[in-house]
Amino acid sequence: MKNLFKGLMMSLSMFTIIPMPYVEWDEDGAKNMMKCYPIIGLIVGCVWFLGYKLINYLNISIVLKSALIMIIPFIITGMLHLDGFMDVCDAILSRRDKEEKLRILKDSTTGAFSVISVIILFFIQFGAVHSFLEYNKNPYILMFLPIISRNIVAYFFITIITIKESTLGSYFTKGTNIKDKVILILELALVCILFGSILGYIGIAILLIVAVAISLCVKKCFKEFGGISGDVAGFSLVVGEIVGLFSACLFT
C-alpha cells in the first residue's frame, strides 16, 4: 500500500501541475504509476468538468468560452501529452527511415510538421467544445474521456515493448506484471459501467471508438518506431481524447 501511494504521488507530480510534497523516486513507486494513471484521468476529468460548468456561467461569448474550456486539460497536465503528440507527428510525417524517425522523436527541436499538427488539433478541439456549448451536450463526457484514454494507454504501455531509446518508458514498466494488467482491465470495466449508466449504449460506443483510435495509434507507432514510449503514449492519449470528443458531438 505504501508503494502504491508513492506511485500515486509520483504520478501526480509527473503528469499534472498540482503541487505535491516531495517524494523520493524509486523503482517500487515507479512500477505502480501506471495503475494510478486512471486516477490522474479522474482528476483531469473533474477539473475539466468543473471548469466547463464555471466558464459556462460567465457572461462572455461562446467563442471565448470554447477557447477557455478547450485548454483546461492541456493546462492541468502541463502540456506534457501535447508535447508527445507534437514529437510523434514530427517524426511520422517526416517520412524518413526508422532510425531517422527515432532521432527526430528524441530531438528537442520543434519541427514544422509538429506545429501544423497541433494547429489542426486545436481547430478540431475548439470546434468540438463549441458544439458542446451550442448544443448543450452532456458535460459528464468531459469527465470520463480523460479516465478512459489514460486507462487504455496505461494498459498498452505495460503490454507493448518499449523503444530501447526510451529510458523513461522502461523505468515505468520495469517490475509490472499480469496483476497490473488485470487491475487496469477492472478499472476500465468500472468506468465502462459508470459511463454507460449515464449515456447508455452511446457511452459504450464512444468508449469503444476511443479504444480503437488509441489501438490504431499504438499499432502505427509500433510499426514506425518498433515499440512504445512516453511520447507515443502522449500522442495516443491526445488522439484518443479528440476522437472521443468528436464522436460525442456526432452521436449525443
UniProtKB/Swiss-Prot annotation:
Transmembrane annotation, as ranges:
4-24, 38-58, 60-80, 113-133, 141-161, 190-210, 232-252
Q: How does it sit in the membrane?
A: Multi-pass membrane protein
Q: Which InterPro entries match?
A: CobS
Write out the catalysed reaction.
alpha-ribazole + adenosylcob(III)inamide-GDP = adenosylcob(III)alamin + GMP + H(+); alpha-ribazole 5'-phosphate + adenosylcob(III)inamide-GDP = adenosylcob(III)alamin 5'-phosphate + GMP + H(+)
- Single Gene Ontology BP annotation: cobalamin biosynthetic process
Copy the pathway line from the protein's UniProt record: Cofactor biosynthesis; adenosylcobalamin biosynthesis; adenosylcobalamin from cob(II)yrinate a,c-diamide: step 7/7
Record-level GO cellular component terms:
plasma membrane
MF (Gene Ontology): adenosylcobinamide-GDP ribazoletransferase activity; cobalamin 5'-phosphate synthase activity
Its Enzyme Commission number(s) read 2.7.8.26
Please state the span of the N-terminal signal peptide per the UniProt entry. Answer: none
Q: What is this protein called?
A: Adenosylcobinamide-GDP ribazoletransferase
